Regions:
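Acyl-donor-binding surface of acyltransferase catalytic domains
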Residues: 1-74, 80-81, 89-92
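Charge-rich, low-complexity intrinsically disordered segments
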Residues: 214-240
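Short His-Asn-centered micro-motif
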Residues: 147-149, 182-185
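Conserved active-site alpha-helix within GNAT-family acetyltransferase domains
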Residues: 186-207
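A conserved beta-strand-loop-helix scaffold within acyl/acetyltransferase catalytic domains
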Residues: 81-153
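Conserved GNAT acetyl-CoA-binding A-motif
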Residues: 172-184
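Conserved acetyl-CoA-binding loop-helix of GNAT-fold acetyltransferases
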Residues: 148-151, 157-170
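Conserved catalytic-core motifs of GNAT/GCN5-like acyltransferases
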Residues: 25, 41-42, 201-217
């Protein structure tokens, strides 16, 4: 049985590339015991000095909703009753991330015409850490790393990500965070397109992991190359 995370990944594949993308993924999964290759694009962007909403002629998205910034287990406990158990990372996992210094942004929208809130999605960020394909390392750059994002299926495509992004950017400005970064699978076309166009990220490198004969032989992109790509991006954006 597929895990919730795999089901979500298949849904993203279908949205971005249709049935051929799903079939390609399935073939690779069948061949994975012999040869398995994973890749993640490394994406990053510099935080603008001011919100796009401050620009002349730019109005706030009309989607009705709110985004809460959660930095402690106590803050999570206050709203956990509205979070469904079906999300990819359950409450216990979210608490562990908070204990590690992560920040979680929760998106809600009004329930029908009443005043109750209903859960839309969440994203997990962490400062000064970079993680890709099972490896993780602290970095000396002033970056906010996006660990994971999930929007419930019934709310996708309704611009709730705009509410989340605005809240996240305001948090970064208040806390002196200069850069955002994350990773996206190359075959996740819908997320990649959104990141590069709507969110104005740049692809600054690609991390690869190749496993042969059930992990007997493994090659991974060296950390030095990943750090160099991040450092070059920071240097160029700082000069600019």
């Amino acid at each position: 049985m597929l895990s919730p995370r795999k089901r979500q990944h298949i849904w993203y594949l279908y949205r971005g590339g249709g049935l051929p993308a799903v079939i390609t993924w399935a073939i690779r999964a069948l061949l994975s015991p012999l040869y398995h290759r994973e890749a993640r694009h490394i994406v990053a962007r510099k935080m603008p000095e001011r919100s796009p909403l401050d620009s002349i002629g730019r109005e706030k998205e009309s989607t009705d909703g709110e985004c809460l910034t959660v930095e402690s287990s106590e803050a999570l406990r206050a709203v956990e009753g509205a979070i469904p158990s079906s999300i990819t990372y359950p409450l216990e996992s979210l608490r562990k991330y908070l204990a590690q210094g992560c920040v979680i942004f929760l998106v809600f929208c009004p329930k029908g015409t009443g005043q109750e809130r209903t859960f839309v999605g969440y994203v997990i960020y962490q400062r000064g850490v970079f993680s890709v394909l099972g490896r993780e390392k602290a970095l000396p750059f002033n970056m906010f790393f996006g660990r994971y994002r999930q929007t419930l299926p019934e709310y996708r495509g309704q611009r709730y990500s705009s509410i989340l992004n605005i809240t996240r950017d305001e948090y970064c400005r208040r806390n002196g965070i200069q850069f955002l970064c994350g990773t996206i699978a190359p075959d996740n076309r819908s997320s990649l397109k959104s990141a590069l166009t709507r969110d104005e990220y740049k692809i600054i490198g690609t991390a690869v992991r190749v496993s042969i004969l059930r992990g007997r032989f493994v090659w991974e992109t060296p950390w030095e190359r990943i750090e160099a790509a991040l450092q070059d991006f920071v240097r160029q954006e700082t000069r600019g």
